[in-house]
From Swiss-Prot:
One Pfam family here: Profilin
Full protein name: Profilin-7
Domain of life: Eukaryota
Originating species: Phleum pratense
Keyword Ligase attributed: no
Oligomeric and partner information: Occurs in many kinds of cells as a complex with monomeric actin in a 1:1 ratio.
Molecular-function GO term, any one: actin monomer binding
InterPro entries named in the record: PFN, PFN_euk, PFN_sf, Profilin_CS
Subcellular location: Cytoplasm, Cytoskeleton
Modified residues (Phosphothreonine): 111
PANTHER family assigned to the protein according to its UniProt record, in alphabetical order: PROFILIN
Length: 131
């Protein structure tokens, strides 16, 4: 299965009539492996900050997390595994696997829980595959 298929069929899938605004699978260096049409372009320093937060949980909390210059307030996550952010009526979930970052961005009416489920389910699957 191609990386684009994972994005199209597993991240951008419909959940209770809703779907993510955008999604992607990136390498730990920020290289895009696959993405949805509207996925924002991360800046290198944003990826650096995200990876540092995985290594040092809480690193982004004081400043917020920036994604394509949009600022997200960092909310509860799983140290070293998941970063969650909130921005207005939407938010972001990033799941770290051995080689990748699985990213989902949502807006209402999709809920944070639905975004978390979609992103973390694929991330957990990739971890089980050694990826």
């Amino acid at each position: 299965m191609s990386w684009q298929t994972y994005v199209d069929e597993h991240l951008m899938c419909e959940i209770e009539g809703h779907h993510l605004a955008s999604a992607a699978i990136l390498g730990h260096d920020g290289t895009v492996w696959a993405q949805s049409a509207d996925f924002p372009q991360f800046k290198p320093e944003e990826i650096t900050g995200i990876m540092k937060d995985f290594d040092e949980p809480g690193h982004l909390a004081p400043t917020g997390m920036f994604v394509a210059t949009a600022k997200y307030m960092v909310i509860q996550g799983e140290p070293g595994a998941v970063i969650r952010g909130k921005k207005g009526a939407g938010g972001i979930t990033i799941k770290k696997t051995g080689q990748a970052l699985v990213v989902g961005i949502y807006d209402e009416p999709m809920t944070p829980g639905q975004c978390n489920m979609v992103v973390e389910r694929l991330g957990d699957y990739l971890l089980k595959q050694g990826l």
